[in-house]
């Protein structure tokens, strides 16, 4: 039995802050031979046409437009994983509360590790708004690696060589 996971779930919001989490998940999956799944979750309000209000003759975005935009973000993240040398077993698009969707998908797929980025919000903002990564850590059935991008984020990779025993 290996101490390494056989399945990893990368939860991403397609933000700049998530880029280091993408590279880290790709690196871990590659080094451990794990299957890598990628998920992007949009809030349900975005997908039921409750986007920006209609102004003049400009219609509010339709559910199809919003779904297409979310699919485009997910496809871009899959492209980033591939650019980092990783292989994606499957891409998943979720709708709803991101923390709940991530935890449920992790359980459904029986992953051994969830990798998620953190925006590093300040204490007051985090207390008022909550944190998807905090909630996933509290509710996931498996270990969760929260990758926080520093202001001086490294462009060359995740520096996993320094973290893993070889």
What are these regions (language model features)?
Residues 57-72:
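A short acidic, glycine-rich active-site loop
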Residues 21, 48-51, 103-104, 126-128, ...:
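Short, well-ordered secondary-structure micro-motifs
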Residues 113-135, 153-157:
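Glycine-rich, Arg-bearing micro-motifs that act as flexible, cationic patches
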Residues 142-150:
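Short, flexible loop segments at boundaries between secondary-structure elements
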Residues 39, 90-94, 145:
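General small-molecule cofactor/ligand-binding pocket signal
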